Amino acid sequence: GALGNKYFRYYDIDLAEAITCSGQLSIRWIAKHMNEFLNKIVGTEDYDYVVASDTDSIYLRLEKVVDKFCANKTKEEKINYLDKVSREIIQPFMKKKYDELAEMMNAYENKMVMEREVIADKGIWTAKKRYILQVHDSEGVRYAKPKLKIMGIETTRSSTPQVVRDKLKECISLILTTDED
């Protein structure tokens, strides 16, 4: 960001480009390996488990994992299962893969760390950095009633009138919490 701004004191387009490329490499690396890993575990072929990615995060859809390993469980049991799988399987796998990337790139040490942020059962992405999730667990905090996580949508922008933000939140909640019936 700042290094690529010609008015920044330490402007250096080469460094800015190097930072951007290394970030892209690390996200693409983990997305590729997560897809391979989850396809192997679940027994699927070329299924894309990575729904979206950002500068420092990936979003996984794990319904096939849930369907295979805890199909007849309650919603609470499924959330507990996903939390445990994230802590005990997915995060260690990501650490291992980022250690491999650091070794391959001859880094002094691996600085890439990813941890689970939320467990959500529904989500809508409209564009990069613009999404809505119906969250059941956020960093270990469990909600009795799911909460909406809204990023980059007009409901979070101060330039959008409050009455419009409130109505948009109502509409989003209605879309995510009700069935077509």
Predicted regions and their residues:
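Conserved pre-motif C helix in the palm subdomain of viral-like polymerases
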Residues: 1, 11-32
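Core structural elements
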Residues: 1-6, 49-64, 122-123
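Metal-dependent catalytic core segments for phosphate chemistry
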Residues: 1-5, 10, 69-71
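Amphipathic alpha-helical interaction surfaces
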Residues: 2, 33-36, 128
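Long, hydrophobic, amphipathic alpha-helical segments used as structural scaffolds
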Residues: 7, 34, 38-42, 101-105
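C-terminal amphipathic alpha-helical
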Residues: 23, 30-34, 86, 90, ...
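Active-site palm subdomain of RNA-directed nucleic acid polymerases
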Residues: 27-55
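C-terminal polymerase-core module
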Residues: 59-181
